[in-house]
Amino acid sequence: MNPALFSNELEYLYTGQGFGEAFEFLYESFESRLSEPQPEGDAEELRIDKLRKDLVFMWRSRLYSDIRISLTGTFSSTPHEDTTAVFASHRFILVSRSPYFYNALVSWAKPKPQQANEPITLSLPSPPFTPASLHFTLGFLYTGTLIFSSTPYDLNTAFAILRSATYLSLDTLYDEIQARIIQEMMHGLFHTFLSFAEYERLTSSKWGTGGCRCRQCARRAPRVLEFAVAHDVRNPYLERGARRALISLFGEGWCTSEFAALPQKLRESLLKGVGKHMTVENVFPLLFAAEHALIKLNPVNDAWGDTVREMIESGRRALDEVLCNQAEACFMQLEWLEIMENDGARFEDGEKAEWIMEAILRGMNDKNCAILYQVRATTI
């Protein structure tokens, strides 16, 4: 075999460029050769897309497969029963795309096939790998992207993919799945890539702004936070964004079993984070959020409801103190002025005024009662 020719063939196999263009010309239809030439950028994208599809076909059809990867763990619906999942793959893809597989197949002692003429089998640990995460990880190795398939993956699988990327030293896969968790699954995760100073400047230090507070984010944020602080993950971006989200979700956003399931130390740190936002400017929005949460928790009889109720009431007590100790400044805020100007015309104004009066009664003490009396006479 001509070495130069073989080198060109390998270049095309790996990159989709070079040698193969001659064959593409020979096998293209006469009509396609007469068509208008496409811009270089589009042509490049088409070549890459074609290469991806060819490699995925080769992988899924097991064409020329020369290696197997096995996982053993409790994957089935039957608890405490180990099962084994086996994936067919190609040595040249694994070695060229992953430092871990390069070491396993080239540098370390070579595993031997169980029988003659059988491909060798590599075993991977579970955890961190699961059948779903390994499927997407292998797909990424073949295509360079996680969108090689229309099959979706859930948040747990995304977590497993990130752990798999760490295990295999795949920085590009790590970055992609991290970005997809943040942007697609958590709707931006409260601008997690911004520093504290940049985020405060963006939100003007107003609580509850700067990110998505939908029901999906409220249920997923506790899971993202617990995952991010795990000893084998320690992801600063996921942790920072999840903390921002949960602090901004104080109130009804905490009324989930997922939040109650967080370790107590994490829940206390989040309440402390809310406390840092208990400023004069934020006192009324936070107080209203706490009251709405307590109303939502009224029909909840499960144990998790008691856990959340205790957290909300603890936060509300701190808000009562801020309101009573800084009453003069608080009652100059827009939320109160709007209630007074509308003269109770809006249905919710009466309810909010009642919540504020109850907060004053709870927070009043010997030290602030004189100030509260003066404010009541001039403002309330």
Give residue spans per PLM region:
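Alpha-helical oligomerization interface recognition
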Residues: 1-3, 62-119, 131, 138, ...
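Short amphipathic alpha-helices and their capping/turn residues within compact interaction modules
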Residues: 14, 18, 98-99, 106, ...
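Alpha-helical protein-protein interaction/assembly modules
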Residues: 5, 9, 18, 22-31, ...
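Extended alpha-helical solenoid/arm regions of large eukaryotic scaffolding proteins
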Residues: 123-124, 136
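A general structural signal for short secondary-structure junctions and capping/turn motifs
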Residues: 58-61, 78-79, 83-85, 126-127, ...
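Structural signal for repeat-unit boundaries in curved repeat scaffolds
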Residues: 131-134, 158
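N-terminal BTB/POZ boundary and linker segment
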Residues: 2-91, 95, 139-158, 163, ...
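Short coil/turn segments at helix-helix junctions and helix-capping linkers
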Residues: 92, 125, 129, 164-171, ...
